[in-house]
């Protein structure tokens, strides 16, 4: 078995070893889990996961790659992704990049090879807590010190809201609606457009 390259360390001191993909950097965030069987690209680009480390309980992630049309926002702001098995050879005629390539492009560190079912049970039983992604060789005490000293971001809206006013118009126009964009997903925009609502995003 090849040596581990990354590990995640929880506030409680628990450690999980695995292998890195995506951005090769240290990162901290609140750890949460998602039980979806498909839709990892939508999760990756969901603004409600900004700066959070998302544990995917479904065991295989990355097998259909990333497509340009399926983002929920212009760019992902997720803190990181933790998966059981990562597939770097997607099979999908629509895909344009691998999950790892996109995460590297946007500075998102990811770890695979983790027992995500056990990790999910810990989150369920102990509640959410902060976590740090570091090199596997880092001592636990040093990782916990860095986690404790890492700043906690408060203003998530600033990162995910629009910078200037923009419009999303629909052909079957019935009403104009002002959307206060605090991190609106593209699917919400599409559904409102389908109902005949043209949106002014502010």
Regions found by a protein language model. Name each.
Residues 2-197:
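RNA-binding accessory domains that recognize and position tRNA/RNA substrates
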Residues 200-202:
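Conserved small/polar residues in nucleotide/adenosyl-binding loops
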């Amino acid at each position: 078995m090849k040596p581990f390259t990354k590990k995640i360390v929880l506030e409680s001191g628990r450690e999980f070893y695995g292998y890195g993909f995506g951005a090769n950097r240290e990162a901290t965030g609140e750890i949460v889990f998602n039980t979806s069987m498909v839709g990892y690209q939508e999760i990756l680009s969901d603004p409600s996961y900004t700066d959070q480390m998302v544990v995917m309980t479904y065991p295989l992630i990355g097998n259909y790659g990333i497509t340009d049309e399926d983002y929920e926002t212009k760019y992902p702001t997720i803190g990181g992704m933790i998966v059981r098995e990562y597939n770097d050879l997607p099979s999908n005629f629509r895909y344009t990049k691998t999950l790892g390539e996109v995460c590297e492009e946007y500075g998102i560190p990811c770890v695979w090879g983790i027992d995500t079912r056990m990790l999910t049970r810990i989150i369920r039983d102990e509640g959410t807590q902060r976590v740090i992604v570091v090199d596997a060789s880092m001592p636990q005490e040093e990782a916990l010190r860095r986690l404790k000293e890492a700043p906690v971001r408060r203003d998530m809206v600033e990162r995910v809201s629009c910078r200037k006013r923009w419009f999303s118009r629909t052909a079957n126009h019935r009403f104009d609606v002002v959307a206060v964009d605090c991190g609106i997903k593209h699917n919400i925009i599409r559904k409102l457009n389908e109902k005949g609502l043209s949106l002014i995003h502010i």
